[in-house]
Structure formats: C-alpha cells, structure tokens
C-alpha cells in the first residue's frame, strides 16, 4: 500500500511539473510551443524555396513561419534572436505569382502586415519587428512552424 501511494504521488508530481511547459503540445524534440503551434529556428543559410522545402519535410503540416498577431511575432522574434544571435530570418510570406498578391506558404490569409517595399520574399528582423522584402534567391536562417 505504501509503495502504491509513493508511486502515485511520484506520477502526480511528474504530471504537474510538465503541465504548462508545452510538453502536452505534442511538438517534436527541439521545437518550441506557442498557442497550439510548434516552432523551430534553423541556423542554416538557405534560399526561400530551400527553407520552405526543409520545413515541409521536417514536420507534418510544416511551413515557413506565418504571423497572425503581435504576440506570435514577439514569441518568434525572441526565439529567433535567442538561438541565432542573427538579425534576420526567412518567413513564409511571398508574392507567389509576382502580382502583389501576398500569401503565406501555408495558404493562410495575410491578416497582419509589417513591411517596406522591395522584391518578392520576406525576411523578419529579430530586433525591431520589421519585415523587409528580399530576393528569394538570397540565403538566410529561417523559422519553421507546424500545428501542435
């Protein structure tokens, strides 16, 4: 009886210590959870296309990161700067048909904006929350996002 109580108490402690850490978000190892999504900062320099392909192969439903509110931007910017110490990362925003019809690589609507005018793919500064268009053939680190 004493062992049963000890084991039960131990399991309760483990459960309580994991709750609220994102462990229950079903993110892959080395991914961080935020608002029912998983994020991974990749410290490899790739073109936009290569980065998007990496993200889609890395996780089920994965794409370059898309932003839908300021809190998500703040989370990713902090995560990116902490890991990379770099000032820019690819994000999933692109003018796919070169007609100024901006889309996220995961097909989501563009409902949050923050950029200046330039080419057809976007980077985000990890300091200052600014988006800038860059040539899709340039290389940068990037952030992947997938559903939890």
From Swiss-Prot:
* Organ and tissue specificity: Expressed by the venom gland.
Example GO CC term: the record gives:
extracellular region
One Pfam entry name = Lectin_C
> Its principal location?
secreted
Protein localization: Secreted
Detail the disulphide connectivity of this chain as listed in its UniProt entry: 27-38, 55-144, 121-136
Keyword tags: Disulfide bond, Hemostasis impairing toxin, Secreted, Signal, Toxin
In what residue span(s) does the C-type lectin domain sit?
A: 34-145
Q: What residue range is the signal peptide?
A: 1-23
Q: Provide the GO MF annotations for this entry.
A: toxin activity
Q: What else is known?
A: Shows greater sequence similarity to the beta than alpha subunits compared to other heterodimer snaclecs.
Q: How does it assemble?
A: Heterodimer; disulfide-linked.
Q: Per the similarity annotation, which family is this?
A: Belongs to the snaclec family.
**Function, as annotated:** Interferes with one step of hemostasis (modulation of platelet aggregation, or coagulation cascade, for example).
Q: Would you tell me the protein name for this molecule?
A: Snaclec 7
Q: What is the lineage of its organism?
A: Eukaryota, Metazoa, Chordata, Craniata, Vertebrata
């Amino acid at each position: 009886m004493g062992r049963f109580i000890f084991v039960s108490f131990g399991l309760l402690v483990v459960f309580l210590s994991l709750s609220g850490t994102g462990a229950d978000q079903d993110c892959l190892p080395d991914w961080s959870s935020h608002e029912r999504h998983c994020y991974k900062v990749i410290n490899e320099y790739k073109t936009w296309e290569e980065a998007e392909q990496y993200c889609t192969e890395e996780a089920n439903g994965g794409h370059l990161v898309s932003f839908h509110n300021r809190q998500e931007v703040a989370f990713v910017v902090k995560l990116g700067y902490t890991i990379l110490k770099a000032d820019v990362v690819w994000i999933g925003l692109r003018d796919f048909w070169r007609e100024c019809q901006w889309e996220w690589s995961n097909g989501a609507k563009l409902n949050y904006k923050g950029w200046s005018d330039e080419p057809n793919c976007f980077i985000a500064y990890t300091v200052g929350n600014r988006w800038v268009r860059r040539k899709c053939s340039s290389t940068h680190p990037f952030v992947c996002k997938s559903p939890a």
